[in-house]
């Protein structure tokens, strides 16, 4: 089976959960910025035991694709109004494409990034253990680049024919609970605008900032700037003041690290983050809140709340438990 790219959209790449274990060699992890939504799309596409199957990540608008054979797909993440052969198709539900069918995902009406998963996953040659596209190193995915019109993506053969898997899933499928439609069950929202409040563990260089700066950071709104990308979300708001500057000897960076730049503005690392950095890190967004950060558009705002390591671990365990409960309900496992 092959999925043909009829129209790629602004930025569509092949992504899985990332190229783990190679930062010491200088390679970014890459992978989906919103791993929750990729996992959800995989679940809905029949890949329940493999939430990290390679699919497509698209930004602001999705691609138009054509199937050459029966193909089971699902969409999650940022919400659009997809169409199959010009007729409305669902988000957050299995979609069976027949030979020659065209799926047009269209512009996102909410969220920043969306995900297309396919039953069996994409049959892309792994590089360093991952099929994810690294746009900086030009490896993984389709020749290490964003997709173009005319690209043909092979789909792995699964353990069951797509049409059989679709029929089986339809017997058990019910509309998703509202919490599943979100990128996460958020800790909270700020005001009537429902701006995400992200939990952040202090450190490792939080001691470089004044107590007043830490308080202001965790009680202020920060707006996403237009120069944000898959590498990092750049924010603008109340400057975070350091005691004696923010430069440090470069040390390791992880997804969710919050650096404070020379002008006092926060930078939140995403999937394509560099392996080291020389700005002080005030904290790290907990892993189950990173998907929410990845879905905030330029011009929208977020807030932060400090939590302990133990609180962060407990929060992510609760999210994992909810996910497992839904998977059991959905697949009867």
Per-segment meaning from a language model:
Residues 1-333:
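Conserved "landmark" site that anchors the functional core of diverse proteins
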């Amino acid at each position: 089976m092959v999925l043909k790219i009829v129209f790629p959209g602004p930025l569509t790449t092949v992504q899985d959960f990332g190229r783990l274990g190679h930062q010491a060699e200088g390679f970014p992890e890459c992978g989906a910025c919103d791993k929750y939504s990729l996992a959800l799309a995989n679940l809905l596409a029949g890949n329940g035991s493999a939430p990290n199957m390679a699919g497509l990540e698209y930004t602001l608008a999705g691609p138009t694709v054509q199937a050459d054979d029966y193909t089971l797909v699902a969409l999650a993440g940022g919400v659009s109004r997809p169409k199959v052969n010009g007729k409305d198709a669902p988000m957050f539900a299995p979609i069976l494409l027949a030979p020659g069918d065209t799926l047009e995902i269209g512009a996102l009406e909410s969220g920043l990034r969306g995900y297309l998963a396919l039953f069996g996953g994409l049959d892309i040659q792994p590089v360093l253990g991952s099929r994810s596209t690294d746009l900086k190193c030009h490896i993984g995915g389709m020749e290490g680049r964003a997709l173009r019109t005319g690209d043909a993506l092979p789909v792995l053969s699964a353990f069951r024919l797509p049409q059989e898997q679709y029929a089986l899933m339809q017997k058990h499928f019910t509309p998703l609970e509202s919490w599943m439609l979100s990128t996460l069950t958020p800790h909270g929202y700020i005001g009537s605008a429902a701006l995400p409040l992200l939990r952040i563990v202090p450190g490792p260089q939080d001691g470089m900032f004044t107590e007043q700066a830490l308080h202001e950071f965790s009680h202020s709104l920060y707006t996403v700037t237009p120069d944000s990308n898959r590498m990092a979300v750049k924010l603008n708001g109340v400057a975070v003041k350091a005691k004696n500057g923010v430069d440090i000897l470069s040390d390791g960076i992880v997804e969710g690290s919050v650096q404070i730049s020379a002008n006092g503005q926060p930078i939140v690392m995403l999937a394509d983050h560099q392996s080291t950095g020389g700005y002080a890190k005030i904290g790290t967004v907990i892993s189950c809140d990173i998907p929410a950060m990845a879905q905030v558009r330029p011009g929208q705002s977020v807030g932060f709340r400090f939590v302990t390591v133990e609180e962060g671990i407990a929060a992510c365990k609760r999210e994992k438990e909810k996910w497992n409960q839904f998977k059991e309900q959905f697949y009867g496992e």
